[in-house]
Curated annotation (Swiss-Prot):
This is Transcription factor PERIANTHIA. It is found in: Nucleus. Residues 192-206 are annotated as: Leucine-zipper. It comes from Arabidopsis thaliana. GO terms for molecular function: cis-regulatory region sequence-specific DNA binding; DNA-binding transcription factor activity; transcription cis-regulatory region binding. The gene is PAN. Residues 164-227 form the bZIP domain. Changing C340A: Abolishes function in flower development. The keyword Transcription regulation applies.
Amino acid sequence: MQSSFKTVPFTPDFYSQSSYFFRGDSCLEEFHQPVNGFHHEEAIDLSPNVTIASANLHYTTFDTVMDCGGGGGGGLRERLEGGEEECLDTGQLVYQKGTRLVGGGVGEVNSSWCDSVSAMADNSQHTDTSTDIDTDDKTQLNGGHQGMLLATNCSDQSNVKSSDQRTLRRLAQNREAARKSRLRKKAYVQQLENSRIRLAQLEEELKRARQQGSLVERGVSADHTHLAAGNGVFSFELEYTRWKEEHQRMINDLRSGVNSQLGDNDLRVLVDAVMSHYDEIFRLKGIGTKVDVFHMLSGMWKTPAERFFMWLGGFRSSELLKILGNHVDPLTDQQLIGICNLQQSSQQAEDALSQGMEALQQSLLETLSSASMGPNSSANVADYMGHMAMAMGKLGTLENFLRQADLLRQQTLQQLHRILTTRQAARAFLVIHDYISRLRALSSLWLARPRD
């Protein structure tokens, strides 16, 4: 709303204490406590109905709260610059904070300060025309300033507290992340340590196996050969145990791929891996046969139920094909013909090897029975040693029989892999593993049976 102003010429007869001063054209405001001296440039008339406008500071009185918006400030400047003389209805003193020098030094009203000062002006009305500011007015003015400072301090404290809380949360998150990182690092270091130990064990076993192989090839003394054979058997059984664990893992992956309808390309990778793993066990058996052929023939490295169905150190290929024929379907006519031919050829090869084993046993029996009962004389000693050399030569063929049997089993699996599709081959490998697992479970039940 509009307010009346009256411009009074400046005289040195009016003095007052100033609480604000300005430097140059800057809007920087500085607050200081009243001083004992009076400044000639800041002298104003504090009479209730007079407004004094000077070139440096402007003090106005209002009969009501002044509208300090952008328009009000401009109107005030125009009246002060034009020298309009208007009177106010009441004598309320207002100190204007937030003025700045514009052009010739005319101040503009700061809206936020006008609101605060207008509220204080309502509480500091005067009824007399004194040249000194009343103590109550100064107290109210200082109280208003202190209230504003207190509100500012409270706001600053709230901001600092909020910032501290965010900092604490961030520190807690950083500590948690660091803890998890330490745990991951510890697990990684432990894994590296386990891998190092495992590698050292493998290197030691490989070194021992090489030493054993060199002993066997060189034909060292009987005691050393027996020691090498014993260590070779132990190494084979250890490697076979690891092979079973790895084979179980591969079968689990293959079963998951079949159940999840994995693509043919990805499934083919798993099937080829299982086939390659079967090739590995045949290689290990070949090494074990060189070390101790009778141990491999007896199948002491297998469970009792597996030994019951064992033929020349392993399974019969023809029986395995019969099991697969009932579980791998549907098969095309060409696949059925291929499997039938494979089964017939496997059966014929098994019969031939079985007949060869029978012939070997009969030949050994005749050789050992035709020799004299003991080397009592020099002639008998020569005859005895001759027959024992013949028997040793015939036993040498036993190793060939076991190799031929393992080769038949390996070729049967490879032919089956080529006849079947990728998905059918995957199911075939699962059926073979499940069958052997049932034999092992049967052996465990048999060994755990109660004995009266």
